[in-house]
Amino acid sequence: LAASSLLGDMLKKQRAEGRMIAAICAAPAVVLYPLGLLGDEKTSGYPAFQRRLDEANRTEERLRVGEKLITAAGPGVAMEFALALAEILKGKEKTTELAKAMLVEGSRCNA
């Protein structure tokens, strides 16, 4: 993904238009950072890749929901990441219904 100029162009356009970008695992460090798309935003990501980021961009949070950037640490956080995206796109009520239907306990939606 990091080598894809098509993806890079799409992400740069997304950022320029002020639209949301979401990335999980190594993607913040190996895709977004080299493209200059992080700005001064904190990002979570897979711990082994976080050291590639500037100190200002690093956080140890499992899930980081910023104004226009959502990042997650890795595969173990995938459900939290998905529910955070669902909440942004469809709202808390719909996301709570979804989490309950999927038997997801302890999510930020049904806490």
What kind of feature is each model-predicted range?
Residues 1-111:
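Active-site-adjacent pocket-lining segments in enzyme domains
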